[in-house]
Regions:
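Long, highly hydrophobic alpha-helical transmembrane signal-anchor segments
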Residues: 2-12, 88-101
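Charge-rich, acidic-biased intrinsically disordered regions
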Residues: 80-94, 141-151
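Membrane-interface extramembranous regions at the lipid-water interface
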Residues: 2-31, 35-64, 129-153
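Hydrophobic alpha-helical transmembrane segments in multi-pass membrane proteins
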Residues: 20-38, 59-91, 102-127
């Protein structure tokens, strides 16, 4: 049996570059302010570090997309939840003791946006860990788009 060793040339990034890249990804825990960190790191490092710049820009785009997705999902959930009040309003005498079953479906469906938010955030934190390790991390959602549009890093 012949063993083939895979040769890779991995660029060693400085600790500062890795820290800035990881911070850009980890900023996802700050919520709506997350893209600001990525944009600030991108703007301050674009002349200094291609690695930190690329990771920060990618993180900012991912976080902005996440904000848009969350706005849409929470708006849809809010609309659905508001619709569950129609039976209560129309038949207030019937539902004095307990809300209709559709109300509980609306409450239970709140888990969907929470799961999406949690997974989105965990993926961002995974990106932070990979960036801290010095890996050339690419988000599955926006990684290729960012690298194609901004090929200078």
């Amino acid at each position: 049996m012949v063993e083939v060793k895979k040769m890779t040339t991995q660029v060693q990034h400085t600790q500062e570059e890795r820290l800035l890249a990881a911070l850009a990804h980890a900023a996802i825990v700050t919520g709506a302010m997350a893209p600001v960190a990525g944009i600030l790191i991108y703007l301050t490092q674009k002349e200094k570090s291609a690695y930190a710049t690329g990771q920060a820009l990618q993180a900012a785009v991912y976080q902005l997309l996440g904000l848009l997705v969350m706005i849409v999902i929470w708006s849809c959930w809010g609309g659905f939840y508001a619709l569950t009040f129609i039976p209560i309003i129309r038949n207030s005498d019937q539902y004095q003791d307990a809300p209709p079953p559709i109300f509980w479906v609306g409450m239970g469906s709140m888990i969907i946006p929470l799961i999406v938010m949690g997974l989105w955030g965990l993926y961002g934190l995974y990106g932070a860990l990979r960036a801290w390790a010095g890996a050339d991390f690419r988000y599955a959602v926006v990684g290729r788009l960012v690298t194609e549009k901004f090929t200078d890093f």
